[in-house]
């Protein structure tokens, strides 16, 4: 009888009658958030510790800079919670989340089961309850058995609920090719097409540590303020990269930007040549800079 009463009520609700109704935006409504305040200076110094504060004054590789950025983000936003395989006690497969569990505790740096569906499901549940989750998928190849958590649940819920419910999150995913001689079908996964096919999803993929920091800050802002879902693809091959053109040149180490972010409509432009334009991202940008140097020096093409 209860089900029948509910059905009788629902059947009288307005239906989608026009093409505009059917094609309504999947993007959830923005929400007003209090402007975050900078963490107390003494607390920040205590949280980072002397060694990392000292390292912050020198150029670093991408893995270290992402670690700095996540520390600052968690200091600034108390509702940010991270979850994933080995991200806490171990500090991540590549050390990207090193010391974060010691800094913020296991309730904000959650070591999960080796199950990507559970990781993303936990993120969805936390988002429902006012948190800003940052789930980590250990390798892009591991996402595919759980991608319906994003396509069928998180990304489409705002549309299905007419904006009443949302699942804002920043999904960090280590991916792209990174190891010579290791099959591309397993850990070395470059299959971004499945993410591009998810309506309403934002994909971000930095090529260097400085951009990674600025883009991660913007991704968190988009999740908090605009209730968006962002797939933040981190190129494994660039995590520890130090050099660009030759051994020891330190051309891929960058200073930690204390402030600022990169908005979605910003692009990076390198060089002022007029002969050729190379458009790329992630690992491709790094390799394109090397190719551009060869083209200019050996073929006088800029």
Residue ranges and their predicted role:
Residues 21-26, 291-293:
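Composition- and surface-driven signal marking solvent-exposed, interaction-prone regions
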Residues 9, 125, 194, 291-294:
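Residues within well-ordered alpha helices
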Residues 131, 300-301:
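Short phosphate-binding/catalytic loops that engage adenosine nucleotides
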Residues 23-229, 233-239, 245:
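Thiamine diphosphate
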Residues 5-8, 12, 72, 102, ...:
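A generic structural signal for well-ordered alpha-helical segments enriched in polar/charged residues
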Residues 65-73, 214-229, 238-299:
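Glycine-/acidic-rich phosphate or pyrophosphate-binding loops and their flanking alpha/beta elements
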